[in-house]
Swiss-Prot record:
Entry protein name: Hydroxymethylglutaryl-CoA lyase, mitochondrial
Alphabetical list of SUPFAM superfamilies matching this protein: Aldolase (SSF51569)
Short name of any one Pfam family annotated for the protein: HMGL-like
GO annotation terms (biological process): ketone body biosynthetic process; L-leucine catabolic process
Motif (Microbody targeting signal) on chain: 323-325
Length: 325
């Protein structure tokens, strides 16, 4: 494959003077949004070519420099299942730990949790789903059985004073079951919250959701779980990620997952774009007058760095618009 020409980020003209649009007809938007950067874990885990440990460490350090307050760093899963995450201990120990920044890691089981804690993890994440078929095909058990597995992690985490974040996959649709009942999403979310997850991220795993579906799902979940404990994780498969995120913001959600450069494809839709690009999210939020604490220019540099390392173009529209290829 021919080497890509190096992309040179241009300085964003007038970013600091972006005027907040009128939000009178949009409902009350949060004044501040916490962005959970998932690129180093969710974005890289399905890359076919192994990304070197130094590159992963530099990416995370650059994201820290950009001001992201939460950076999901790696996954303590067996290298047999996810070879890309085989260097999890080296990555977690090798990154600079910036004051005020959290570096959670994914721990699918108790063994992974114990390894993560031994490596210095202060926060972990667990993955559930609102679809029985997805759960069966993904981790070979029922939703109820998955809760039993999570219970061991949550009890160990409580004893070790480790915070646990929960994920609910297929919140807006499933590759196997199709439509998912909002009541089912609410049920699974409520269970994770009652078990001790301080925050639950509701994921549109295959990116089929629309703002209308997002509104219906969140309305059901918000009846069971405090709004402050909810986050959204949108995929852009059908170009709906920003629209769905905006709907969630209008409903009061103030925590959003995203991935630098839009890293992370949708494994169930061949060739489809994956995670919401952090650059695009930050640009939208800044334009709405919502504080993020993120330096967009430094974020663009981090995205450019990892795209060069992967020899691919960015999926971020903002990065595409502000770079000379």
């Amino acid at each position: 494959m021919a080497a890509m020409r190096k992309a040179v980020p241009r300085r964003l003209v007038g970013l600091a003077s972006l005027r907040a649009v009128s939000t009178s007809s949009m409902g009350t938007l949060p004044k501040r949004v916490k962005i959970v950067e998932v690129g180093p874990r969710d974005g890289l885990q399905n890359e076919k070519n192994i990304v070197s440990t130094p590159v992963k460490i530099k990416l995370i350090d650059m994201l820290s420099e950009a001001g992201l307050s939460v950076i999901e760093t790696t996954s303590f899963v067996s290298p047999k299942w996810v070879p890309q995450m085989g260097d999890h201990t080296e990555v977690l120990k090798g990154i600079q730990k910036f004051p005020g920044i959290n570096y959670p890691v994914l721990t699918p089981n108790l063994k992974g949790f114990e390894a993560a804690v031994a490596a210095g993890a202060k926060e972990v994440a667990i993955f559930g789903a609102a679809s029985e078929l997805f759960t069966k095909k993904n981790i070979n058990c029922s939703i109820e059985e998955s809760f039993q597995r999570f219970d061991a992690i949550l009890k160990a985490a409580q004893s070790a004073n480790i915070s646990v974040r929960g994920y609910v996959s297929c919140a807006l649709g499933c590759p196997y079951e199709g439509k998912i009942s909002p009541a089912k999403v609410a049920e699974v979310t409520k269970k994770l919250y009652s078990m001790g997850c301080y925050e639950i991220s509701l994921g549109d795993t295959i990116g089929v959701g629309t703002p209308g579906i997002m509104k219906g799902m969140l309305s059901a979940v918000m009846q069971e779980v405090p709004l402050a404990a909810l986050a959204v994780h949108c995929h852009d498969t059908y170009g709906q990620a920003l629209a769905n995120t905006l709907m969630a913001l209008q409903m009061g959600v103030s925590v959003v997952d995203s991935s630098v450069a839009g890293l992370g494809g949708c494994p169930y839709a061949q060739g489809a774009s994956g995670n919401l690009a952090t650059e695009d999210l930050v640009y939208m939020l800044e334009g709405l007058g919502i504080h993020t604490g993120v330096n967009l220019q430094k974020l663009l540099e981090a995205g450019n760095f990892i795209c060069q390392a992967l020899n691919r173009k960015t999926s971020s529209k903002v990065a595409q618009a502000t770079c000379k290829l």
